[in-house]
């Protein structure tokens, strides 16, 4: 009787490590190939589009193969891994295939058609003039060191050890010279920065972690909210002692600053591409923590909800839930202009009554919205200096120019009104009874209530105040929900650890008020409850100015513990269940009133 044929080996597994297979960028991708036994690994063949690339792979301690594939042209490529039989009588090999799609390093991946014109700022950022129309510039590597007196200073020669060089001990117990490698360049038309401890003389490698890197990444986001059409010069900041001293690498890009780009879709894309480049340079990060305040918090909330996997945990500060439901911004403009008008003055409003009608603890907060951000709903008011006057919209002299409103940044998602070219707006105050709660409580008179609502007005398509109320474009409302511009909290945010770390500024000097009012933290909490039945994945920290530093340290420390527990949990359950059951038992809402308590 003939011997039975040997059983076929299980097929290898091909995994893109640096990004999702459909979102490869820049012509390279870090790939892992796993086999089910080391015998198969010794007889492995790996190809890209029929080309043998096995030499690009290294065997890792767990028996898998890790390789950085380079030179991919734009478009689709097929990776094939074949575990061949090891000799006569051995089981036949099995083949695995994975298609990857490579995109230009200048983008886009998923954000849609890029804005044009787009004004480059590489020279202003110190990278030299752009090398193409997509605002590219050569990558720069420089070094900084931390002094014993607590500042970062340039280090022209990384082989030199200055007399005032500090050392630092990372969270995994390694003590290293506090030298930082700073990489700056361009990705997705943004200027990016990556900082990490690096006291070695060899370049970083995705195959071996740097001695000072703790294999974690913090991704920072900057605040504001304005129209795009330009590159920007600053990032969310990467030279941060809080992170670097503990061994975290830090990354960010200029399109992760909301004042440069008030679109979390573009921000998410830039973050994904920068993170891909980071992993291909340093290796896979165990997890990535989002960090940043105000508009930076909006980006974290929306990216975590709509693009899960880019950020594993988030630490929003001065937080807001999203930008489109900040209806108080245009409302505060209407109220401020009314109170300063003859009708408002004649109605005799006191400071207390203005606050009561606005719903804020002080009307100063509402007035700050009017002064600082309400212009972002007006196509004529808020153009950044990077956009030349000749390129800006004017209804008569340049009707096809750049409309400098925040709605313009999400026009790809909202669509445009073909009659006038403006993005469909969800802006609406039809039926709003300003000051109703104040009237019901007796804080204002009926005459004041009527005067306010008769004279509040609304906005025309340009964003200028008019006597009539404004009705939302139904298409704009529908698409705001459909495309995730309104943060329900029911998607990826439900399975994201959140530590909301707020410095209390509701009545802060010098204005006696602030736009970053505390209740927005609880708006996020309620949305999580409404969408998921629980908000156990969110913790709220709050501090006064003297306790803010201690609060930030605690937020990072607690987020690290939370993510480490999730990372180690391989028990059954959904992602949301793993987040909640691994929340540290002693982690709860807390406040700080001093650097120590």
Located regions from the model:
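Sec-dependent, cleavable N-terminal signal peptides
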Residues: 1-8
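C-terminal His-loop and adjacent cap/lid subdomain of alpha/beta-hydrolase
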Residues: 9-293, 297-597
